[in-house]
């Protein structure tokens, strides 16, 4: 795929000297990927959308070309039946150091208008950026991460002097609809240390995040005439659902939660004839708080059963959606980032994310926890979205140094 004409014209006007050779390479790759409409579908996540498969095929072709040009034996890439792209580059050292995994995602959000995406190259505060014409999203989330990962693969394959352990890459579908790890092959992708290229603010690395559960309770009512309700054992599902919601202390609600505090959030009710289902979000960082919330949920159900004996109660959903990566994070992951950042003169801020990441979804499926690295994206999930090439290059440099640091681990 070639540059869109308008992007080429603006790029030529800016001049290649406006950015480094690395940025030039990443710009070409990013614009190619951004021009592919790879929105995921929340209602029909599987099989993956045609645009995501197009992205997967474009990535595989690029990696195959890089492998063919290199002298690296044993490097492989494949697309799974479910649309995941896996890349493996074997270690080029004899040391038994940990394997390193890098993840990102193929899809872009369905929450904003996609379709005929027209990437435009521009400048902002002296940096080269890529934006849209304001009528569609750009897909910087996470085509910035994809571009950085592909550039890292090219560099490692073309520079055998860079010593490294086994490297594993996963380009995942359906992240923006919360399904990135649903069909991941943990036999193919199961690194000892994981980093996710999907962050926004420059220099920020997410070291922990919410654990997220979906907890849905159905209240099955029993109809009767109100005038004879007691004799006919009237079961009021609406009243029971209201009592269930009211059981949770106001202090446990999201509007009273900050920092590393979690919350219980009954956020939606659905009604089907006599039955009412309460849909609840449960979020926490610390396992001890999660155990407290478990007791609160069980207590709420027991209380409603006692107060409304004619209403049957069913827990219809109790799913772990994503997990705090800190639970299983490699003990030297933070040191790796700090050492790598120091070598390139970068100031890093470690944060606790009140949300989830691709790595958090993977952790919920049994993989080791992974930090999330900034990737040069801004104003994501909107038609104001843009990508900053200098910040993408900075993320690339940080990850390359992390790769070089791995052999020092035992």
Where are these regions (language model features)?
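Midchain, well-structured core segments that form catalytic/ion-binding scaffolds
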Residues: 121, 125-136, 174-295, 299-302, ...
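Active-site metal-coordination/substrate-binding segment of hydrolases
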Residues: 94-162, 166, 171, 394
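Zn-dependent metallopeptidase/amidohydrolase metal-coordination segment
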Residues: 34, 272-274, 347-401, 406
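Flexible, glycine/charged-enriched surface loops at secondary-structure junctions
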Residues: 70-78, 161-166, 250-265, 304-317, ...
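Sec-dependent signal peptide recognition
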Residues: 1-7
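Hydrophobic h-region of N-terminal signal peptides that target proteins for export
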Residues: 9-17
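Active-site-adjacent substrate-binding region
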Residues: 239-256, 263-265, 312, 320-374
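Acidic/His- and Gly-rich active-site-bordering loop/insert found
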Residues: 19-129
